[in-house]
């Protein structure tokens, strides 16, 4: 047992020393581009598992007859949010002028290269997973209380306007970033945006509001 402990400690020490020496080594721009892009893709895949978790959580909150509808709603939401965020949302989030509020409503094109340090498509993939997670928060909150097509319309608005604007305030270099605000994992930009969006929908609920009937 003691020998195994010493072996593990030795391996950990060797890894720490090698990682430190590797960090001190100057990496080429191409190498930084590859590793940074790979990091975005891996992070995006991990965040994507949140969507599966949200779907299972939401399915457990509803009656058995609604489970298939919930699954279809989550799959459709994922597709709609990805497409809309690609066309409009990404450029709107990162096109914010320094200290500004709203970016550019234009179709995004990837102009990244080795000098930028990462692929624009990898960052888009990573951020898209956060968009889907934000929409999933609202989806779970309105489970069995909203029709599927009105929710898809809401998901498109969320991915194309609501979330990108709030995201641009901090991650896009907007007024929150200029004020020193930091959000590393989306506690405000993702969860806060989803919660506020739901409360806005809830505040406008009426007996005649078709979105909430059936």
Language model feature labels by segment:
Residues 1-24:
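N-terminal secretory/membrane targeting signals
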Residues 86-104, 144-145, 166-177:
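Transmembrane alpha-helix boundary signature
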């Amino acid at each position: 047992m003691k020998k195994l402990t010493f072996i593990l400690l030795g391996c950990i020490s060797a890894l720490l020393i090698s990682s430190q020496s590797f960090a001190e080594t100057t990496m080429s721009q191409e190498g930084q581009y590859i590793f940074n892009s790979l990091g975005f893709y891996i992070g995006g895949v991990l965040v994507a598992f949140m969507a599966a978790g949200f779907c299972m959580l939401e399915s457990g909150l509803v009656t058995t007859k609604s489970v298939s509808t919930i699954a279809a709603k989550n799959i459709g939401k994922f597709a709609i949010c990805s497409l809309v965020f690609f066309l409009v949302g990404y450029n709107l989030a990162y096109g914010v002028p320094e200290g500004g509020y709203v970016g550019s409503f234009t179709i995004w094109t990837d102009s990244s290269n080795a000098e930028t340090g990462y692929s624009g498509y990898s960052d888009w993939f990573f951020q898209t997973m956060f968009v889907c997670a934000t929409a999933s928060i609202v989806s779970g909150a309105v489970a069995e209380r909203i029709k599927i097509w009105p929710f898809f319309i809401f998901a498109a608005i969320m991915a194309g306007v609501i979330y990108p604007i709030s995201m641009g305030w901090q991650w896009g270099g907007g007024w929150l970033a200029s004020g020193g605000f930091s959000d590393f994992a989306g506690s405000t930009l993702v969860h806060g945006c989803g919660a506020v969006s739901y409360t806005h929908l809830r505040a406008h609920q009426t007996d005649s509001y078709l979105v909430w009937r059936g």
